[in-house]
Curated annotation (Swiss-Prot):
CDD domains: Ribosomal_L7_L12. Keywords: Ribonucleoprotein, Ribosomal protein. Belongs to the bacterial ribosomal protein bL12 family. GO terms for molecular function: mRNA binding; structural constituent of ribosome. The lineage of its organism: Bacteria, Pseudomonadati, Pseudomonadota, Alphaproteobacteria, Hyphomicrobiales. Forms part of the ribosomal stalk which helps the ribosome interact with GTP-bound translation factors. Is thus essential for accurate translation. HAMAP family: Ribosomal_bL12. It holds the Pfam family Ribosomal_L12. Coiled coil: none annotated. This is Large ribosomal subunit protein bL12. Disulfide bonds: none annotated.
Amino acid sequence: MADLAKLVDDLSSLTVLEAAELAKMLEEKWGVSAAAAVAVAAGPAAGGAAAPAVEEKTEFTVVLAGAGDKKIEVIKEVRAITGLGLKEAKDLVEGAPKPVKESVAKDEAEKIKAQLEKAGAKVELK
């Protein structure tokens, strides 16, 4: 149990960038994605009230589909948006399609998409 307590202390002392890098390393090591889980609401019972109106999606994932011809400009924009280092941003751009930002508001996602497209990238919102 002492090892677990030490692990909790070590994880608590990580900076945000270090925690993001740790999450990325664990995703690669375990072959999983840290995308937010989506809860599924149960439908109305038979003979019940009409189904509620479809809710508008509030969280988006900005996915870099391709770097296009201006790869260096796209890498610069990815660095500015994510705060990643040069190597990490380059790896993300070269490994496209990859998520750039996850669980962001619609207006922020559209802003990021516009920035990346201005730099020459192909971007999708999911």
